[in-house]
Amino acid sequence: MKKRKALWVTMILLILVSLGIWLYQGDLPAEVVDAKYTSPSSQFLTLDDGARIHFRDEGNRTGLPVVLIHGSMASLHAWTPWVGRLGKTYRIVTLDLPAHGLTGAVPSGDYSGAAQLRVVQAVTSHLNLDAFVLGGNSMGGGVSWRYALEHPESVLALILVDASGPSAWYQARREAKPDKASPLAFKLLGQSWFRAIAARIDPYYLAVQGAKSAYNDSPVVTDALIMRYYELALRAGTRDAILGRFNSWQGPGRQSEDLSVLTQPTLILWGREDSVISVTTADQFQAAMPHSQVIIYDGVGHAPMEEVPERSAEDVRRFLKALKRGEV
């Protein structure tokens, strides 16, 4: 009996060790990832706390500045389709927030919302942008309207693309009807047991499932797009930084910001099939913000700027032209 028990214990240990080896994935050297995902437009700004922020300043340098902020787990590469379509007329500035893209981990370990706002301010100040249009997708949309609340004098207009809203909106929705369709990575990162191992396991499956879910199985989800998410996540230090960011957001409570004080003209763009942030949130934004307009894209998921770049860029162009004429 003892021999049989010892055999079973040994077999279980071997299975667990084999599973751990199979799931394990080490980091990729930062210099290797950087070499692949930088472009001739890439620049790096070192802040006082040692953080090295990756940003791009592209398009028409004499045009109206438009600053665009990516979403959670994404990078400034998400805005490439708009840069190509809007850059002839507008100056397009994109950046990688801490724990993302080629910015990655920062020495301070501060991945809070306040730190995100400081990065936006640092980059725009570095570029001497006193006033600009500010836009963002998902988490980046939340960064955008929060920045406008803190620096209303700097933000001429807002572009919110499937943007995150005040946390109280989502807390109430989760309690009423838990969302079962969103990318698996976001659900798992909400679990303490997964965060304990997430920095060492291979995130490839999560990258595939997350992209297909967020992009509503759009044909833009190519092998290259999946590898971009995957390799940027594996950049040395980034997975630990992602965990630091999610840990810093645990237990947000029911705080709510008064969006009605935002008087800037606001364009709200949303994919009707968004599995990350419900399309009903677009109506909440419009109800909360007095000078806003909404455009909904049928058959589109969480990233209209990538899924329907021509249509969404044209809607932005129309909005910015109306802004210049004082018609919004």
Task: List each language-model region with its residue ranges.
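Conserved HGGG/HGGXW glycine-rich cap/lid loop of the alpha/beta-hydrolase fold
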Residues: E58-L102
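Short beta-strand/loop motif that positions the catalytic acidic residue
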Residues: L262, I268-W270
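Conserved alpha/beta-hydrolase catalytic His-Asp/Glu region
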Residues: V33, Y170-R173, R195-V261
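Active-site loop/oxyanion-hole signature of alpha/beta-hydrolase fold enzymes
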Residues: D48-G50, R56-E58, T94-G135, M139, ...
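Alpha/beta-hydrolase fold catalytic core
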Residues: M1-L64, T89-Y90, L129-D130, K321-V328
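Catalytic active-site module of serine/aspartate enzymes centered on a nucleophile-bearing elbow/loop
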Residues: H291-V328
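Flexible "cap/lid" loop of the alpha/beta hydrolase fold
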Residues: L149, I159-R195
